Swiss-Prot record:
GO terms for cellular component: plasma membrane. This is Olfactory receptor 51A2. Odorant receptor. Pfam families: 7tm_4. The chain crosses the membrane at residues 28-48, 57-77, 102-122, 142-162, 199-218, 239-259, 275-295. The gene is OR51A2. The lineage of its organism: Eukaryota, Metazoa, Chordata, Craniata, Vertebrata.
Length: 313
C-alpha cells in the first residue's frame, strides 16, 4: 500500500506500523498479541468481579486496586482497535480524528494509572504508619471522592492534547512509528510550529515524574516504619502487601522509561525495537498486574481459586 508523502496536500489520514520487516508474519504475530490482550482483559475483569462480589474485600486498598484494574482495562481497550486492524486485517490507516481520540484515551488512562499507584502508596503508608486511624480517615465516601478527583485530574491533564494536535498542519509525512497513536509520535509529523505541544508534552511527562518520586518517597518511609511493628507476623504481612504494590509500580514505570529513552535516541535505534518497546508499554503492564496481585495477595488468590472451583462444580 502506497503512503502519501507530499508537501502540497494536507494529510487527514495517518498510517500506523506493525513489525517493520516482518509484515509477512503479521497474522502469526497476532496470535500472541491477541492472547495477551485476552489475558489482560480477563485478568483485570476477574479482579473487578472478585472485589465487587466479595464483601470482605470492600475496603480502601481493594477499592484502589479496582481503580487500577479499570485503568488497565481502559489502556488495553484504547489500543486494541488499531493493533488488531494492523496485525489481523492488514489495515494500518486511521483517520486523524480517530488517532487524536486514541492518543487522548491512552495518555489519559496512563496518567490515571500513575495517579492510582500514587494513591495506593499513600494508602499503604497510612495503613502501616497509623493503623488505628486508617479506617476512620479512609472512609468509603472519602475513597470515592479521591477516585473522582484523580480521575478528573488525569483526563483534564491530557484534554488539550487532541486540540493542540488538531491545530497543527500535517503535510509532509503521515507514517507513525507505532501500532497506535501517541502524542509525542504524532506531533513530530507536523509541518507547522509545534512548540506548544513540545512544552505541554514535557509538562505531562513532568507530572508522571513527580508521581514516581512521591511513590518512591512513600515506600521509603514505609520500609523505615515496618521494622518498628511489634508483631513479626504483621511485619511480614505489611512487607508482602508492599511487595505486590512495588512490583506494580516497576511494571508500569519501567516500560515508560525505556520507551522515553528509545524516543530520545530514535535515530540510533532500529524501527523494530521502537515498535516492540511501544507494544510492551501497553501490553505487558495490564497483563502482569493481575497476575502479581493474584499471586502476592492472599485474599484475592483464595477468592479466585474458590470461584474457579465453584464454576468447575
Amino acid at each position: 500500500m502506497s503512503i502519501i508523502n507530499t508537501s502540497y496536500v494536507e494529510i487527514t489520514t495517518f498510517f500506523l506500523v506493525g513489525m517493520p520487516g516482518l509484515e509477512y508474519a503479521h497474522i502469526w504475530i497476532s496470535i500472541p498479541i491477541c492472547s495477551m490482550y485476552l489475558i489482560a482483559i480477563l485478568g483485570n475483569g476477574t479482579i473487578l468481579f472478585i472485589i465487587k462480589t466479595e464483601p470482605s474485600l470492600h475496603g480502601p486498598m481493594y477499592y484502589f486496586l479496582s481503580m487500577l484494574a479499570m485503568s488497565d482495562l481502559g489502556l488495553s481497550l484504547s489500543s486494541l482497535p488499531t493493533v488488531l486492524s494492523i496485525f489481523l486485517f492488514n489495515a494500518p490507516e486511521t483517520s486523524s480524528s480517530a488517532c487524536f481520540a486514541q492518543e487522548f484515551f491512552i495518555h489519559g488512562f496512563s496518567v490515571l494509572e500513575s495517579s492510582v499507584l500514587l494513591i495506593m502508596s499513600f494508602d499503604r503508608f497510612l495503613a502501616i504508619h497509623n493503623p488505628l486511624r486508617y479506617t476512620s480517615i479512609l472512609t468509603t465516601v472519602r475513597v470515592a471522592q479521591i477516585g473522582i478527583v484523580f480521575s478528573f485530574k488525569s483526563m483534564l491533564l491530557v484534554l488539550p492534547f487532541p486540540f493542540t494536535l488538531r491545530s497543527l498542519r500535517y503535510c509532509k509525512k503521515n507514517q507513525l512509528s507505532h501500532s497506535y497513536c501517541l502524542h509525542q509520535d504524532v506531533m513530530k509529523l507536523a509541518c507547522s510550529d509545534n512548540r506548544i505541544d513540545v512544552i505541554y508534552g514535557f509538562f505531562g511527562a513532568l507530572c508522571l515524574m513527580v508521581d514516581f518520586i512521591l511513590i518512591a518517597v512513600s515506600y521509603t518511609l514505609i520500609l523505615k516504619t515496618v521494622p518498628g511493628i511489634a508483631s513479626k507476623k504483621e511485619e511480614l504481612k505489611a512487607l508482602n502487601t508492599c511487595v505486590s504494590h512495588i512490583c506494580a509500580v516497576i511494571i508500569f514505570y519501567l516500560p515508560i522509561i525505556n520507551l522515553a529513552v528509545v524516543h530520545r535516541f530514535a535515530g540510533h535505534v532500529s524501527p523494530l525495537i521502537n515498535v516492540l518497546m511501544a507494544n510492551v508499554l501497553l501490553l505487558v503492564p495490564p497483563l502482569m498486574k493481575p497476575i502479581v496481585y493474584c499471586v502476592k495477595t492472599k485474599q484475592i488468590r483464595v477468592r479466585v481459586v474458590a470461584k474457579l472451583c465453584q464454576w468447575k462444580i
